Amino acid sequence: MSATHIENRDDSFLENKGIDHIGRPENNNGSQEPPSPSGFGGHLIDENLVRVEGEDKVTWYLCFLISASAIAGFLFGYDTGVVGVALPLVGTDLGGSALNSSQQEIITAGTTIGAIFGSAILGGWGDRLGRKGAILVSDVFFTIGAVIIASSYSVPQIIVGRIILGIGVGGAAVIAPLFITETAPTAVRGRCIGVNAFFIPFGQVVSDAIGAGVQNMHNGWRLLFALGAVPSLLQLLLFHYLPESPRILILKGDTEGARTVFQRIYPTATSEMIEYKFRVAHEYIAATTALQSGTTFWERVKKVLKTGSYRRSIIAVSALQAAGQLTGFNTLLYYAGTLFGLLGLSNPALGGLIPAGTNAVFVLIGMSLVDKVGRRGLLLIGVPIMLLGHVWNIVSFYYMCKPTGGFLDTSYSYDTTDVGIVIGGIVFFVVGYGLTYSHLVWYQAEYLTLEVRSMGSGIATTVCWIANLVVSVSYLSELETMTPSGTYGFYFGISVIGFVFLVFCLPETKQLSIDETSLLFEDDWGVKRSAQMRKERRETRKRLQDAELGEAATAHLEARQQKSTSVSPAELSKFMAGLKGGKRTPSASV
């Protein structure tokens, strides 16, 4: 981001407040303007922001804000996972005949098709609607879609309902993590985004658990889909009590509202610290205004794709999303009932809990480690585990399906030991996926500057859903033509390519503020720049801590000296009496 994108900042309010000025170079016209954010006095890190973010605390208000936002993640998970357990229960309720494999694929893909449009539209309009407004619009689509699906008596009706539902899924997938990214304090931002990411597999687990319980219930599939409207209505109610993202409030001119939100997020920070945080956010928002003013949406897209830093950041997060989808993980969710039925399990819906439950557990582990190990750190640990799981699936499916010519045959009873080994491979694969892609893809907003954050998130999430669509509509056909072993071999090859790209092109964002992460792609893909910025931030924080300890030690020493040199009248009288008696009282010595 160039300096010309940023407004002048009046730092006079910082005098004698313990917060340093940022020097302003003169521009060609001789007037002063603030430096590029990458030039804080010759450093990559703004020491004043480090001081402000030292006030990060997890408060009840923050917990409420994150939990209410993460309901969108639960809806995302529930509505994508429910189809895998609901479709086997439909029977002949839609048109008088059982669903064939093509109809199942289209119904399953309906949500994905809607999500492509939802992520593109709500992502592109995220700045104008606001983060809060976009989530509320998504909730409306969730509710309408659930009602249409639950009341369906024909295949076309349920497809329409799934598409409408998908618009809500796509919008929530873009905006919810974006909203959390912009409101969470730096020190806990990873875990806060992780809450939303955890709610996705948690929603899938809930859908599988309810599905297992309604297996023998008449119209149980209708209940499964109808229950999807409950969380969306709850979020509509809770969001009435939540604020807009402070950066959107500044963008819309509500500066006092933005200051209030910052104060609630950083309750122990001084007013001067809050003011400094506000001023820095205001500078970045000026770049958004400069990009959007006087241009159409497509002109902004063209400008964004022509600018190297914007283009690289969007490519990186889009590749991250695509890599996560092209592992083939979601096929285990969408077709869990069908797949585990083919493997001979008596309750396929209960079998679907195996991948969903494993995923939820390891997403929880991953989100608890993400602020310590880092985003790249988890990728470097978890993706190799996932790749080994792919190899396990390739080999185990090959040997299990040998008696049936390499293909899965519903009429054949496979050896229970072989089935157990296959399930073990699936679980091992999901362990690696849960630690990595299952939640790390939703950290995408961290890598995008504010002026392209909504648009870039929309593009990346649209890529996610396109890749999801390709995988979901082709999976059953691949099993029938490429064999299960060949199908997972194909996913293995794509996963290796995606992993190699991310190793070289996805920088680390832990320890960096949301304003600092937007600087990573200025010159290249930012991997080395990230390491340099995080090193400088650690050194800055240590210097501030040492300074605070030094100040505390000095104050303590001065207090002791003051105490030792202060003599009360009683002590003085006792001391003088001792002198008259020819001895010096130690307790009164000075």
UniProtKB/Swiss-Prot annotation:
Q: Which residues are glycosylated?
A: N100
* One of the GO biological process terms: myo-inositol import across plasma membrane
Q: Name one Pfam family in it.
A: Sugar_tr
Top-rank lineage group of the source organism:
Eukaryota
Entry keywords, A to Z: Cell membrane, Glycoprotein, Membrane, Transmembrane, Transmembrane helix, Transport
Catalysed reactions listed for this entry: myo-inositol(out) + H(+)(out) = myo-inositol(in) + H(+)(in)
What is this protein's name? Myo-inositol transporter 3A
UniProt lists the gene as ITR3A
